[in-house]
């Protein structure tokens, strides 16, 4: 049985607004950043690194791609950064857009709160950049 967990570690990452959000392209960059190994050879260290990209993951079964939902992080200049448009896409999915996201309601609520915090963090970063 899945044990969906909200990944608050994304709050420690820097935020940027300077990138369009393409989840598929981002996924390719992310996997390359995680490891040069084929994902079938990944161990616990690679999966811990992979987890940093997502708002929600299944802590019961963290060793498969289906255990991760709502990506918001990409690689920018060789470093992981929260992408503002990725956060917006996650918020929309949590609100039901694009067929929504299949998660228990309590997890959706916590993920929504986390996404709101990330959005506020990105708003502040954007304000600083505009000054």
What are these regions (language model features)?
Residues 1-131:
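Extended terminal accessory/targeting regions
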């Amino acid at each position: 049985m899945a044990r969906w967990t909200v990944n608050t570690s994304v709050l420690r990452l820097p935020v940027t607004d300077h990138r369009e959000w393409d989840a598929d392209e981002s996924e390719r960059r992310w996997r390359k950043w995680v490891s040069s190994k084929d994902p079938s050879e990944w161990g616990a260290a690679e999966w811990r690194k992979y987890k940093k990209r997502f708002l929600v993951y299944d802590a019961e079964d963290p060793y498969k791609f289906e255990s991760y939902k709502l990506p918001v992080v990409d690689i920018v200049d060789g470093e992981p950064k929260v992408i503002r448009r990725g956060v917006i896409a996650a918020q929309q999915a949590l609100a039901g857009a694009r067929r929504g996201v299949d998660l228990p309601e309590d997890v959706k609520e916590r993920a929504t709160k986390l996404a709101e915090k990330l959005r506020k963090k990105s708003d502040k970063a954007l304000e600083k950049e505009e000054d």
